[in-house]
Amino acid sequence: MKLLYEGKAKRIYETQNPNEVICEFKDSLTAFNGEKADEESGKGALNCAITTLIFEALEKEGIPTHLIKQIDETKQLVKKVDIILIEVVVRNIVAGSLAKRLGLKEGTKLPFTIVEFYYKNDDLNDPLINDDHAMVLELVKTRKELDLLREYGLKVNKFLSEFFDKVGLTLVDFKIEFGRDENGNIILADEITPDSCRLWDKKTGKKLDKDLFRFNLGNIKEAYTEVLNRLKDVK
């Protein structure tokens, strides 16, 4: 397989179909824009399984994704997309950069869900942007597309909040990415995993996400395995 692209968490390979690629989840762990890095054996397989499970559930809810099927422990066959260079961050509870930026106390429940856009650019440390910035940077074609990203973000949040709640997890916040398929349709891409979500146990408040690695709070593999096992029980 010819390697087309390698990022911090995934490798993308070409297939015989020009509109499909293989996405391989790596065992690498990174935080603080790559300043902190490590490896955790089995982490790629866990994130691949979690993303497959969640994307299949989202498809049933009418939210289009790039997933075609999982083909082995760490690989998915997905639709080839042109990634939109906007990270859509959805927040239900104050945590992370929001607490730091606005001086709000971590753990505070927000009065309503906040949707933020970040410019996907490592050299600039993925800065927070507004709609005007997105248009000036030509990250989207129209403001209606920004509205669609926001709408999808809120739809994903509504579904995932209920999905995780069923297994005793609070969805604090998450990051998602989108791309354009061969027909120009905007669809959900990348992943939804404990790498890209903050998940807290409802009873204990225990973190079951990448903050464990960021701040040396516990074992990533144990936490991600627990998340996957809980999600398998969703009825």
Curated annotation (Swiss-Prot):
EC numbers on record: 6.3.2.6
Any GO BP annotation: cobalamin biosynthetic process
InterPro entries: SAICAR_synt/ADE2_N (IPR028923), SAICAR_synt_PurC (IPR033934), SAICAR_synth (IPR001636), SAICAR_synthetase (IPR050089), SAICAR_synthetase_CS (IPR018236)
Reaction catalysed by this enzyme: 5-amino-1-(5-phospho-D-ribosyl)imidazole-4-carboxylate + L-aspartate + ATP = (2S)-2-[5-amino-1-(5-phospho-beta-D-ribosyl)imidazole-4-carboxamido]succinate + ADP + phosphate + 2 H(+)
Organism whose genome encodes this protein: Nautilia profundicola (strain ATCC BAA-1463 / DSM 18972 / AmH)
Pathway: Purine metabolism; IMP biosynthesis via de novo pathway; 5-amino-1-(5-phospho-D-ribosyl)imidazole-4-carboxamide from 5-amino-1-(5-phospho-D-ribosyl)imidazole-4-carboxylate: step 1/2
Pfam families, per the entry: SAICAR_synt
The protein's name in its UniProt record: Phosphoribosylaminoimidazole-succinocarboxamide synthase
The organism's place on the tree of life at top rank: Bacteria
Keywords carried by this UniProt record: ATP-binding, Ligase, Nucleotide-binding, Purine biosynthesis
Coiled coil region boundaries: none
Keyword ATP-binding annotated: yes
GO molecular function, one term: ATP binding
PANTHER family associated with the record: MULTIFUNCTIONAL PROTEIN ADE2 (PTHR43599), SI:DKEY-6E2.2 (PTHR43599:SF3)
Family: Belongs to the SAICAR synthetase family.
